[in-house]
Design a protein with these regions (language model features):
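Conserved phosphate-binding elements of NTP-dependent enzyme cores
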Residues: 1-173
Length: 173
């Protein structure tokens, strides 16, 4: 028996729908193999929010800046440099051609919802199967880059989806 509660899905501030669904690692590997990434010397780890060379240095890959408002709770605003994408400008230059001929960078994919990414990554079976579970449970509207800590009420069906499809391979809390 597994307990599925309403806690946010995010383990840390860099957790997203893509990391929780375990597709971010796959996407990073795909983008690291592209000719432009190889030419620039990027590896899969460089596309990480946590430590990668391509993460935004201003917000440290969180996509937000916290403003200290005296006597009130801190206010989070989108990062003025990456505009919430979590990546620096160089990441936008590494683009992958889809089956339909469109070009997308990893930051652009992370800004898309599950339904859009399913179409853009239709030639990637592993990613498609993991995202299809979310889509089937009515979560196609979630963006891949949506912060995991902000998804609370939506987390229950996402946890079920991830458990059902063994997306994370871990027991849920």
């Amino acid at each position: 028996m597994k307990l599925i509660d309403a806690d946010p899905i995010g383990i840390n501030v860099c957790s997203t729908v893509a990391t929780y669904a375990n597709v971010h690692d796959e996407l990073r590997k795909v983008y690291a193999k592209l000719p432009d990434a190889k030419k620039a010397g990027y590896k899969a780890g460089d596309f990480s929010y946590n430590t990668g060379k391509l993460r935004c240095p201003t917000c440290d890959g969180t996509g937000v800046i916290s403003l200290d408002v005296q006597f009130l709770p801190d206010v989070e605003i989108p990062c003025p440099d990456c505009h919430g994408s979590r990546y620096n400008g160089d990441a936008g230059h590494i683009k992958r051609k889809t089956k339909s001929g469109e070009l997308y960078s990893l930051p652009e994919l992370m800004d898309m919802d599950v339904q859009q990414v399913l179409q853009a990554c239709e030639d990637m079976k592993k990613i498609g199967s993991r995202l299809q579970i979310l889509q089937d449970l009515g979560l196609g509207y979630l963006t891949l880059g949506e912060a995991g800590g902000r998804i609370i009420a939506k987390a229950i069906p996402e946890k079920i989806a991830c458990d059902r499809g063994s997306i994370t391979g871990k027991y849920l809390r």
